[in-house]
């Protein structure tokens, strides 16, 4: 999506390949390295968890920073003056993963369950939903050969999503009554941008349902 929005190719293909390899290596290392070090040295459970968090959160977030720089450089080469909704969702998804991963790592160090909980919402809920919308807002209008149905709903889904807390993949956290009530309100309101984006994409696809159904990627994005 970023390449199509730019000059038809990524600003750096080498960057994309290298970051993909490093991301996979870090993910595998975070699972295997604590076990190997635990066999070689007398590591406590806390030290093993620290190593795992270091690889899973902090180091991987640096890899995503390189991805984000590549995406920004690619989009800067675009022919039109308008940055598409798909690219905005992609920017926000990458930024959410970067900051959320840091929140989770330092929250674990400080033993702050509230910081870890917020980091999980950023790196999981915000990131995943934003990436789904990024793909859908790029693929569906092209498959339907129609513009996005409602610009207002696009802006609503983009802005409100990152001011609320999507109620997905939740985990327990210690908090006072005020924070619990505030969290419940934000999780309830979070359904609005998701519904707005879903309706917007669905109505766009109905403009040319045959074209969307004939393309598996567009159909999958619509159903997602």
Predicted segments, located by residue:
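Alpha-helical transmembrane segments of polytopic membrane proteins
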Residues: 1, 52-63, 117-130, 181-194
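Juxtamembrane membrane-water interface segments of multi-pass membrane proteins
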Residues: 1-21, 36-50, 69-88, 103-118, ...
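Alpha-helical transmembrane segments of multi-pass integral membrane proteins
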Residues: 26-32, 62-66, 87-106, 129, ...
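General N-terminal targeting signals
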Residues: 54-57, 135, 141-142, 165-166, ...
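Catalytic cores of extracellular degradative/oxidative enzymes
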Residues: 97, 124, 139
